[in-house]
Amino acid sequence: EGEIMQKILIHTEFIKLDALLKYAGLCETGGEAKELVQGGAVKVNGEVCTMRGKKCRAGDVIELDGQTVEVGQGQ
C-alpha cells in the first residue's frame, strides 16, 4: 500500500502509541495523539487501534493520514 515514510528507532523494549505519534512528528501534543487514536485514525500493522497506550515494538508499522512509520530497534 503506502511506502514506509520514516523509521523511528527506539532504545527500549517498546514505546506507547501516543508517545510514538508525538516522537515521529505525526501530531503535536499528547492530547492530539489521544484524540486521533481514540477516533480510529491510527492503524497499527494494518488494523485500526484505539488504545493509545498500546505497546509498539520493533517491526511494528503505524499509519496515520497516509503517513507510515516503522518502529526499529536502536542500539
What spans do the regions from the language model cover?
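C-terminal structural segments of small proteins and small subunits
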Residues: 48-75
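Short, Lys/Arg-enriched N-terminal segments with co-localized hydrophobic residues
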Residues: 1-4
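Short, contiguous acidic and Ser/Thr-rich linear segments
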Residues: 8-12
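A basic, amphipathic helix-loop patch mediating RNA/tRNA/ribosome contacts
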Residues: 13-58
